[in-house]
């Protein structure tokens, strides 16, 4: 999903350049954004919004970063993300790339109930699992403490 982040950052660079008066650079980044987005859609997205990487992360990034072109693709991607969330019992199934955006992807696409359901999940891996285990800070791992109260030694 590095491509998704590249496209997102290129769009941000375009806006930043325009904001500071670098119109020529802004136009260049805007053109690069268009080319990269078109490539992304042709390579990774089907007509009905399915992505070649069928994961929570892929759909969350595509929705959050506005990488889908048609309402049909957006609706299809959202439905697939909802299905993947249900399949995973609303536990977080993203890595570092998708975790910061998955709740926004739901909320910004009128699926706020899914965002709240994922946020309220207490089974590992979830945002509330560490809280249910007494955490007062962010853990390095979802399961730093095991259900029996022992520290996870890792592997």
Predicted features along the sequence, with ranges:
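Active-site core of glycosidic bond-cleaving carbohydrate-active enzymes
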Residues: 1-155
